[in-house]
């Protein structure tokens, strides 16, 4: 997990996006300085490109694939699993989407602790099979996303002869 960032260390503008549990998977609304980012990245654990980040509080189990961009995440609320080459991240992302975390059902304040993650049994097929399963579900997710998008119709208010003065209007079809 990343090192704790305090509110006074953030700003509304800046170089490095800082994701809290409420902005995780969306747009950052806080930023930290490059200097603080570089210091913490060098001193403390930091995810590697392709790691699956998981929310450990709030909307427990929400996942995001870490892109490798310079960004920082809220301490123990956003975690990832360091693992060896016997586990494929695309398969892990699928697993995270269906797992029933032991010990969090019924509690008033939902929280996913390291023990919940580390003590969860997972049956692993071969890495090659994990990659195929992960790719299959990633493609399925992409198809679902494409079908959920609304088409955009583009109408031109002028002819091609008046291209420099052309205006485009966008209409979302319901």
Language-model regions, residue ranges each:
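Feature detects amphipathic, helix-rich regulatory segments
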Residues: 1-174
């Amino acid at each position: 997990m990343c090192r704790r960032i305090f509110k006074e260390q953030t700003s509304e503008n800046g170089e490095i996006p800082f994701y809290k549990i409420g902005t995780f998977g969306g747009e950052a609304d806080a930023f930290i300085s490059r200097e603080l980012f570089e210091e913490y990245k060098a001193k403390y654990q930091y995810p590697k490109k392709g790691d699956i980040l998981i929310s450990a509080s709030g909307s427990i189990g929400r996942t995001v694939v870490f892109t490798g961009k310079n960004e920082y995440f809220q301490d123990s609320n956003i975690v990832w699993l360091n693992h060896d080459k016997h586990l494929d991240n695309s398969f892990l992302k699928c697993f995270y989407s269906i797992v029933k975390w032991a010990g969090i059902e019924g509690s008033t304040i939902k929280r996913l602790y390291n023990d919940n993650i580390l003590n969860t049994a997972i049956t692993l097929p071969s890495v090659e099979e994990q990659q195929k399963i992960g790719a299959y579900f990633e493609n399925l997710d992409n198809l679902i996303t494409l079908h959920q998008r609304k088409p955009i119709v583009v109408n031109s208010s002028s002819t091609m002869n008046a291209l420099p003065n052309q205006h485009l209007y966008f209409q979302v079809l319901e």
